[in-house]
Amino acid sequence: MSLKWMSVFLLMQLSCYFSSGSCGKVLVWPTEYSHWINMKTILEELVQRGHEVIVLTSSASILVNASKSSAIKLEVYPTSLTKNDLEDFFMKMFDRWTYSISKNTFWSYFSQLQELCWEYSDYNIKLCEDAVLNKKLMRKLQESKFDVLLADAVNPCGELLAELLNIPFLYSLRFSVGYTVEKNGGGFLFPPSYVPVVMSELSDQMIFMERIKNMIYMLYFDFWFQAYDLKKWDQFYSEVLGRPTTLFETMGKAEMWLIRTYWDFEFPRPFLPNVDFVGGLHCKPAKPLPKEMEEFVQSSGENGIVVFSLGSMISNMSEESANMIASALAQIPQKVLWRFDGKKPNTLGSNTRLYKWLPQNDLLGHPKTKAFITHGGTNGIYEAIYHGIPMVGIPLFADQHDNIAHMKAKGAALSVDIRTMSSRDLLNALKSVINDPIYKENIMKLSRIHHDQPVKPLDRAVFWIEFVMRHKGAKHLRVAAHNLTWIQYHSLDVIAFLLACVATMIFMITKCCLFCFRKLAKTGKKKKRD
């Protein structure tokens, strides 16, 4: 840690002693890439407020880097995996999900997707084993007396650490495949009649056939698809804790779920008291651009600029795709700033400049920005919402197709398919988003909704973490559904009992009627004989 950061940190620690004593110790179980970028914003704010934040990360971590100066402390534990192992896996997963997995049939697509998820699950369980079975590490964590643990629900293990350390924990989450974690671990409600299943790319305004599709998705994810190899995880958790348990049972003990979206993005749906939506917590006003970049932006005149970024994971775009995209960009009057780390396309126009990195938030907040070409990552979409910039989506994998579908449904974006799009498709989508005022109007409506919140998303996220620390949990917000079996939750035992009562009554009434009928019949016959 640099002298500068050490001084800042010591001042913050001293402020705790002279304050009301509310500063706490936060342990973090992180996730890589955009998940970490989002969570880091929360952690930096916690540090600003005087809390001690320690991130538990493996020696193979890609982004959580101990060499970078920060007031956030790192506890690095050894693992047999290497950074190259993880990078290679993520790149292969990205390529397979984006280009190789066929979308021709529902069954084939999700069967291959489950294989990918289970490979990811195997990496996660290895990292988890290396942490919780490290006796020296666990002893050190026990002695540190943490107040709370913050984890991303996509990567299991944080809840196991919290259980072993006997501390409350919270989740940060965008979504899990098919809402499997939210349903089974969080008890969330998703009525299929009007809440589209994630990855279905549907909106809340579904016609009859779309509701059928949504129901099929829901049944598939509820009864067939497993985002994790649950047998392995359940067995591992039971062995470590020394009692029979399951992954989802342990996840169900989360005090709060901080969902990284908001109602400017989500479709309205019911949610539980221990859920808060904090989408866009990383967004902030734009800062001035570097001098050379600002000069290029200003040279666009009244036509303005287009910002183009497909995120940090795409670094191997084919030459054919790059040329096709560059050709489309060359045909618009706007200047284009394209985040691209590859061979310069032959069709690159004079209006387009390539950059290995872009100050994306600052560009989207620039008054000359007319449109944003994005892969549909949640962080990028929220920066576009924050600054009111309409989008053209080129979704690649994970939640990106669904994110862009949400923006399309709200009239703030158009999308093209990277597998099938032509230069003409991209050009037409760009022209529509830039020239048709309805897209700007709709994104500005979402932007106004986002800014018109009683408490900022980041402040709400930090409030709930501090709340859990102050009260040693938030059990009063946790629904009793977590204590019920599947049969009890769906009231199947009650329904069975009531049906049995009705059946018994019908049986008894029938028997009584038959008895009376026989008596009357015998009486009638006797009178005839007399």
From Swiss-Prot:
UniProt KW Transmembrane keyword: yes
Bilayer disposition of the protein: Single-pass membrane protein
Residue numbers carrying N6-succinyllysine: 136
Signal peptide stretch: 1-23
Regions that span the bilayer: 495-515
Listed EC numbers: 2.4.1.17
Highest taxon above the source species: Eukaryota
InterPro entries found in the cross-reference section: UDP-glycosyltransferase, UDP_glucos_trans, UDP_glycos_trans_CS
Main enzyme class: transferase
Catalytically driven reaction(s): glucuronate acceptor + UDP-alpha-D-glucuronate = acceptor beta-D-glucuronoside + UDP + H(+); 17alpha-estradiol + UDP-alpha-D-glucuronate = 17alpha-estradiol 3-O-(beta-D-glucuronate) + UDP + H(+); 17alpha-estradiol + UDP-alpha-D-glucuronate = 17alpha-estradiol 17-O-(beta-D-glucuronate) + UDP + H(+); 17beta-estradiol + UDP-alpha-D-glucuronate = 17beta-estradiol 17-O-(beta-D-glucuronate) + UDP + H(+)
Biological function: UDP-glucuronosyltransferase (UGT) that catalyzes phase II biotransformation reactions in which lipophilic substrates are conjugated with glucuronic acid to increase the metabolite's water solubility, thereby facilitating excretion into either the urine or bile. Catalyzes the glucuronidation of endogenous steroid hormones such as androgens (epitestosterone, androsterone) and estrogens (estradiol, epiestradiol).
Family: Belongs to the UDP-glycosyltransferase family.
Name the UniProt record assigns to this protein: UDP-glucuronosyltransferase 2B17
Highest classification ranks of the organism: Eukaryota, Metazoa, Chordata, Craniata, Vertebrata
Gene: UGT2B17
